[in-house]
Curated annotation (Swiss-Prot):
Keywords: Aspartyl protease, Hydrolase, Metal-binding, Nickel, Protease. The gene is hupD. Belongs to the peptidase A31 family. Gene3D superfamilies: HybD-like. PANTHER family: HYDROGENASE 1 MATURATION PROTEASE, HYDROGENASE 2 MATURATION PROTEASE. This is Hydrogenase expression/formation protein HupD. Pfam families: HycI. Not known. Could be involved in the processing of hydrogenase. It comes from the Bacteria. One of its GO terms (molecular function) is aspartic-type endopeptidase activity. It comes from Thiocapsa roseopersicina. One of its GO terms (biological process) is protein processing. Ni(2+) binds at E20, D66, H97. SUPFAM superfamilies: HybD-like.
Length: 221
């Protein structure tokens, strides 16, 4: 008797850099609003990269949400399947996590445990260079259609999904309350307190080391 396939739905990206968080937010919304078949595992992969390889190796079916530079207009959502997925993840890398996930897929293939079915649901980001920022409205609007696309794809593998009556579900798979989308957006300090382009301590340090005319070694102490 054929057993149900092991299915992994994975969101990758970085919540701290605006639209980079699309994949993580998509899985968060899926966990919060839908109950899935018991053979489906939802995972916030964040920027873990190579550390995800064991999870990927166990999956027969892998669905990935991510912000991807397709070279398309901002906000465009695009699906890519099977052997095309690594090529699109690597075409225009926007962050180190994409390099890491390419390596995850390559290592899984090398070890002979590559998913039989692979779907990438990506969205072209609007803004990435906003440290501590949230999804832009144009990207946030893509979460629901991205989830619908994933559920339609998973239905062919016998996955049954039903809406939760209460979206305040308490789950270890959801982010820390401080990183919940609403809390994250409403609790963000103003630009006079929180630098928008990175850690101000690091930026100040780098600025102090900038080479000035007549001072080839910078302002090092």
């Amino acid at each position: 008797m054929r057993s149900d396939p092991e299915i992994l739905v994975l969101g990758i990206g970085n919540l701290l850099w605006a639209d980079e968080g699309f994949g993580v937010r998509a899985v968060e919304a899926l966990q919060r609003h839908w109950v899935m078949s018991s053979n489906v595992q939802l995972l916030d992969g964040g920027t873990q990269g190579i550390y995800l390889v064991d999870r990927v190796r166990k999956a027969d079916v892998l669905v990935v949400f991510d912000a991807v530079d397709y070279g398309l207009p901002p906000g465009t959502m695009k699906r890519v399947e099977d052997d095309e997925v690594p090529r699109f993840l690597g075409a225009k890398k926007m962050s180190l996590h994409q390099t890491g996930f390419q390596e995850v897929l390559a290592l899984a293939a090398m070890l002979g445990d590559y998913p039989k079915h692979l779907l990438l649901i990506g969205v072209q980001p609007v803004e990435l260079d906003d440290f501590g920022g949230s999804l832009r409205p144009q990207i946030k609007e893509r979460i629901t259609p991205a989830i619908e696309m994933a559920l339609e794809y998973l239905a062919q593998f016998g996955v049954v999904a039903r809406r939760r009556e209460d979206s305040t579900v308490d789950s270890p798979h959801l982010p820390h309350p401080s990183l919940d989308l609403i809390a994250y957006e409403s609790g963000r300090p103003g630009p006079e307190i929180a630098c928008r382009i990175g850690d101000e301590r690091v930026l100040t340090s780098l600025s102090a080391r900038t080479v000035q005319p007549g001072n080839p070694h910078g302002d090092r102490q």
